[in-house]
Structure formats: C-alpha cells, structure tokens
Amino acid sequence: MRTRPFFGARLEDRLKKVINRVLKRRGWQESVRPYTGYGTSEQIRVLARIVLQPSKQFGIVQAANALLYRRGWRNFIGFSKADAAASIRIGNTTVPVRADRGGYIDVRIKNPGLAPGWHSVTIQGSDGASAVASVQIIGDDITFGVVSDIDDTILSTWLPRPFLAAWNSFVLTEQARQAIPGMARWYQQMLEANPGSPLIFVSTGAFNTYPMIRRFQKRHGIPHGAMLLTDWGPTNTGWFRSGTDHKRTALRELARDLPNIRWLLVGDDGQHDPELYAEFAELQPAHVLARAIRELSPGEAVLAHGIRLEDGEHRWNPTTAPEFRAPDGDGLADKLRKLDIISF
C-alpha cells in the first residue's frame, strides 16, 4: 500500500519551497485571506489562506481602475505559503494553528460562548499580517438551511466550455458577469421568512475567486453565507482534484456539523448536481428537505454535456425528498411554494 504522497504533489511542494524563498528575497510579504465560516453552539469552522503577495503599492489612479474594472486574473495574484504558522482569536480565546501544503487553514475550534448570529474572528500570520473573517453561528433550534451551487446557479459562466471558462475566470471584468434572474430575490425571501437559517455555497470553483464572488453577491443582492470552495492543482493522490468528490465531502460535513438542519439543495443541470443531490438525499434522508435544479438554456445545456434529458420518465429520483426544476429563481420559488414545505 502506497503511503507516500503522489509524485505531482511532491514536485509541487518542492517548487513551492524554492519559489517562496525567491519571492521573499524580492520583497513579497505574507498576507492572510479570510473566508466566511460557520459554527454552532459547540464548534466554529474557520477558513482562511496564507499567501505571499507583492508589497508594491499602486498609485491612486491605478488603484481606482483596479477596483472598478477588476478582471479575473487579479484574483490569482499571490502564492501560497505552505505549512505557515498562524493563530486564530475568537473573543478572548487564541488558538495556534498551521496551514496545510496549499496555505489553507480549515479548522474547527470550540465555541467560547458566541451566541447565534454573525461574528468576527481574527486570523494572525506569523509575520504580523492579519485579517478578519466572518462566521455565522447557527442556533440549535434552526432546522432549515440552503445549500447553493455558484456557477450557472447564481452566476452565469457557461463554465463547461473550456475557452469561455478561461475567459470568465481570467479576462472578463466582474461588472460584465451575469446573475441568474430571480435567484437573489428567492434567497432573500427564504432567509427573511426563516431568520437565523444558513445559506452555504458549495462549489467546485477555486478559493482564488472568492473575492470576486463576494463582490458579485453584494452587487446583485445575494445574501451572505459561508463558501466551501476548493483548490486547483495536484493532490496527494493524483494530478487533479475531483469536483464531484469535493461537493460530496462538503455535504457530508454539513450533515455532521449541523445535524438538526434539513437542507434545500439548489444547483443546476449542467454537470453533476442532480445526481449528487439525489445520492445525498438517498443516503442522508433526514438532512434533505427538497432539491431545486435550475434548468440551463438549450445553448448552455449543449455546451455542458451535449444532450439534455427533457422528460423525467427515465430519470431516477429518490422518494425521500422532492425535486423541482425551473430556468430561474422566480420559477423555482413558485414551485417551492406549491410544495408547501417551508414558509417564505
């Protein structure tokens, strides 16, 4: 049985060590990138990343242009600082932690007494850099929550087409990205009618795109929530990460961390969301309220997988949680109302 990490991961680790030394000599400085987390009365999941970034400051005009016309490639500036030491401060409690080989911090810490609601935690790097992350503490009495995909569910990317995926990720300005109609309004209505319920985004997108996604959500009125994204590059078992496995693991962790909640799973029919959600509903029936699938347009569907199964006669569905489909948020909201399983 092989115990050594995959060759690609070992090669990447060696290259990172060399590049880290070079970048430090060139004046690059440590930076902490915080991500939104979640927690309960017992534990808090804190997410962040330690990276090296150029220390050069832009002029006023350049900074304004960068702010107003951010392009995707700007989200990828920075180089991970592997195994970096850090600490997390929650109230009067400070906990030492260490980043993984990708510079990521993903830890669960005992809740020192934070009440349900939104709170701030501070992540401090070993070289003095720090950042504040938001965490939502979810009350023990909360029984409803929403899990949402991002690409082609709230944000139109035409992601499965390789050229457009690269264009959207690295070139397209953030202001040019399109929101799926009605999704923000639907999410707002559900969370307003069910105060304290979490909205958690689970996506195969890279954590590098987190700042862009947050700005997009704010601009289009999409409620704030934890984002469980992934990383690009080799793993300890292969050259590429499995997006399907990432989502499957994220759903299992949510069921474990928030056992009282039954989830409305929201995704699209462009890739694997219907199958993943059906599998989760079958294996964890106590944790799934319903499954909402946004139907891609014919053009999007062809780019996603070439064909589209229009009728449900041959589509398998678990009987434990209803599934409904519509092309936008307003249509999905109407169908959920007809099911009469939650109020909003």
Give the location of each predicted region:
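Intrinsically disordered, serine/threonine/proline
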Residues: M1-S134, I138, G329-F344
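Residue-level marker of positions within ordered structural domains that often coincide
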Residues: Q53, T157, Q188, R256, ...
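Alpha-helical substrate-recognition element adjacent to the catalytic core
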Residues: R2-S31, G37-T40, L47, A82, ...
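C-terminal cap/substrate-recognition subdomain and adjoining C-terminal extension
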Residues: M1-F6, R21, G205-F344
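Glycine-rich loops and low-complexity Gly/Arg-rich segments
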Residues: R71-N75, G113, L159-R161, F170-T173, ...
